[in-house]
Amino acid sequence: MELKAMYLYAAVLAVLLCSSVNFIQSPTDVLGPVALLEPTPSSARDFGAVVSDAPFAVMRPESPDDIALLLGALSSTAPSPRATVAAVGAGHSLHGQAQARDGIVVETRALPRDVHVVSARAHGGDDDATVRAYADVGAGALWVEVLEECLKLGLAPPSWTDYLYLTVGGTLSNGGISGQTFKHGPQISNVLQLEVVTGKGEVVTCSPTEIPELFFAVLGGLGQFGIITRARIPLQLAPPKVRWVRAFYDSFETFTGDQELLVSMPEQVDYVEGFMVLNEQSLHSSSVAFPAQLNFSPDFGSKGRKKVYYCIEFAVHDFQQDSSRADHVVKLVSAKLSYLRPHVYSVEVSYFDFLNRVRMEEESLRSRGLWDVPHPWLNVFVPKHGITQFKGLLMDTVSADDFEGPILVYPLLTDKWDGNTSAVVPAAPDGVMYIFGVLRSTDPARCGRACVDSIMARHRRVADEACRDGGGGGRGIGAKQYLARQPSPARWRDHFGAGWGRFAARKARFDPLHVLGPGQGIFPRTDSAGSM
């Protein structure tokens, strides 16, 4: 290990002492057993495809110890401002958050991706014992890999993201939300233990009771305090199948009212989401994964006025062979909803296919050349009182004629979010907030760089207006952005609000030289602890 550390130390010094502009020697020539590799074009690319900051080198660690050696060397050599490190998983950041200009990118997919399931049922056999089941997971594992392994024992994590081809460490560094969040909370509220390499190069095991400050800091911490290398995730019984329901609306108020009714029934309903239907294309693309015939032919504006429709989707887990209970629940729940009669549709699918539904949408977009394209997305948490105002702001910037992609709208309950984590949600006096997710794909043939920049500028104006505090008679809504990169450190302080002091104190404790997470743009690199 000492020899390995010496090789890495020399490599790090080469990074520190040489400019990315005039550096001639390849990093692979000076390394030894811990390799820093030449960057490739993919090292400066992410799913958003709107920011491209090339690193100096790439690390593919074999173990957390490799990362610890790297960060330990960087934190002990009074490095230059360029010596930063970003962790990247599946590369699904939207605004370059997992990039490190002239720094080092650590590819966590190179770490062991094992999924080890421990089930208390093997010792007890009663259903209550499954609450104590968990999976120890390498942070570079994809959630779909976790699902596949857990289902072998009839188990699954309770909380998900819509898209499963994301890494465990990546979503836990942000939040992790989907239609189960109203019931179980986000993924960051469903973690028992973490292994983390801090910005000082320390490998630490932490939990709500063991070094809790680090545990809660890294959950939703945007990669600022440490790199998650393992996670222990609680498991529950997985249903063999799911009854999946969609209902259509032509009134935003009725649509959101019914969503709030659904999330008030967690004993009956297991998943609630919804989306706006702007045009024929959005109706078609949102139906790709839904394996039922939709006899819904809305009028989007043939009478001269644009009309927007809405769709609620909810799901009921089905543990019975004959599906009678799930069908009964769906019938009772649907009877309470005020959808456009008769436009409610129900289908039975396997639990795996339901959770993996976005994969079909991905394949459809790939076939049309609309997956590896710029994605100028906008995700905003909006308190319930501001959703109508926010929808108005949003629709002023969206053209229904050519919009490509879903606009998600569904409620979340703020009491399901642990306030000890680093995640930021808006103040919602009634405990209800909505996620608005504008998940746009841009066709390069019709929308070049100037067009993408224009979309992002419009999104910034919407976010600025919505995130202003509405107190004192102001027009602001008090919303909070999600998965976004703020334009300056000052704007990050505004984003965190009263939580900024705690966030900054955690940074000073676990990454005092500001080595980690440069792509977020929160903390400029410093040469000494405590300076900015």
Swiss-Prot record:
Gene3D superfamilies in alphabetical order: 3.30.465.10, FAD-linked oxidases, C-terminal domain (3.40.462.10), Uridine Diphospho-n-acetylenolpyruvylglucosamine Reductase, domain 2 (3.30.43.10)
InterPro entries associated with the record: Cytok_DH_C_sf, Cytokinin_DH_FAD/cytokin-bd, FAD-bd_PCMH, FAD-bd_PCMH-like_sf, FAD-bd_PCMH_sub1, FAD-bd_PCMH_sub2, FAD-linked_Oxase-like_C, FAD-linked_Oxidoreductases_BP
Residues of this chain annotated as glycosylated in UniProt: 420
GO cellular component labels: extracellular region
Residues binding FAD, per UniProt: 87, 89, 91, 93, 97, 162, 167, 173, 177, 228, 482, 520
Protein localization: Secreted, Extracellular space
Superkingdom per UniProt: Eukaryota
GO molecular function, one term: oxidoreductase activity
TM ranges: none
Modified residues (Pros-8alpha-FAD histidine): 92
GO biological process: cytokinin metabolic process
PROSITE patterns: FAD_PCMH (PS51387)
Major place of residence: secreted
Residues spanning the signal sequence: 1-26
Pfam families: Cytokin-bind, FAD_binding_4
UniProt catalytic activity: N(6)-dimethylallyladenine + A + H2O = 3-methyl-2-butenal + adenine + AH2
FAD-binding PCMH-type domain boundaries: 51-238
Subunit and partners: Monomer.
Function: Catalyzes the oxidation of cytokinins, a family of N(6)-substituted adenine derivatives that are plant hormones, where the substituent is an isopentenyl group.
Family to which the UniProt record says this protein belongs: Belongs to the oxygen-dependent FAD-linked oxidoreductase family.
Designated name of the protein: Cytokinin dehydrogenase 8
Species: Oryza sativa subsp. japonica
Gene behind the chain: CKX8
